[in-house]
Amino acid sequence: MSLLLPDSGLIFWMLLSFGIVFAVLAKYGFPVIIKMVEGRKTYIDESLEVAREANAQLSRLKEEGEAIVAAANKEQGRIMKEAMQEREKIIYEARKQAEIAAQKELDEVKRQIQIEKDEAIRDIRRQVALLSVDIAEKVIRKNLDDKQEQMGMIDRMLDEVLTKN
């Protein structure tokens, strides 16, 4: 049983050496250890505060990013709307100009057709007049073989000219 229950002298020397070690540690070791623990605690507290600030800043940045994305989407929508309006305007203007050009072209073609028609009518009238003169000349030559018929014809024509004027 001596192993389980130490002698009283051994207990005395164990308590004395424990007290001396404890006193030395209390005087020199514990203040250093406490100072190191407090320094570590301060460092951890500062790190936690920095982490909180970083989280808050991250949240603000995230909100700002979302606001920027929302503004960009709004701006994109506005730009798309303006582009669609501009496209419609350009299409409208192009159609309008095409209609004007087509109308001008149509008017020019109509005018050209009218000019050609008038020229054709004049040409036909000239040809009819020439044919009429040729026919009249041939008829008159046949009918006016004698002098008296010629003089009668001249008198009738002069009378017609005078009555018309």
Curated annotation (Swiss-Prot):
InterPro entries: ATP_synth_b/b'su_bac/chlpt, ATP_synth_F0_bsu_bac, ATP_synthase_B_chain. GO terms for molecular function: proton-transporting ATP synthase activity, rotational mechanism; proton-transporting ATPase activity, rotational mechanism. It is a single-pass membrane protein. It holds the Pfam family ATP-synt_B. The chain crosses the membrane at residues 10-30. It is found in: Cell inner membrane. GO terms for cellular component: plasma membrane; proton-transporting ATP synthase complex. The keyword Cell membrane applies. It comes from the Bacteria. Keywords: ATP synthesis, Cell inner membrane, Cell membrane, CF(0), Hydrogen ion transport, Ion transport, Membrane, Transmembrane, Transmembrane helix, Transport. Its main location: membrane. F-type ATPases have 2 components, F(1) - the catalytic core - and F(0) - the membrane proton channel. F(1) has five subunits: alpha(3), beta(3), gamma(1), delta(1), epsilon(1). F(0) has three main subunits: a(1), b(2) and c(10-14). The alpha and beta chains form an alternating ring which encloses part of the gamma chain. F(1) is attached to F(0) by a central stalk formed by the gamma and epsilon chains, while a peripheral stalk is formed by the delta and b chains. F(1)F(0) ATP synthase produces ATP from ADP in the presence of a proton or sodium gradient. F-type ATPases consist of two structural domains, F(1) containing the extramembraneous catalytic core and F(0) containing the membrane proton channel, linked together by a central stalk and a peripheral stalk. During catalysis, ATP synthesis in the catalytic domain of F(1) is coupled via a rotary mechanism of the central stalk subunits to proton translocation. Belongs to the ATPase B chain family. PANTHER family: ATP SYNTHASE SUBUNIT B (PTHR33445:SF1), ATP SYNTHASE SUBUNIT B', CHLOROPLASTIC (PTHR33445). This is ATP synthase subunit b. It comes from Bacteroides fragilis (strain ATCC 25285 / DSM 2151 / CCUG 4856 / JCM 11019 / LMG 10263 / NCTC 9343 / Onslow / VPI 2553 / EN-2). The gene is atpF.
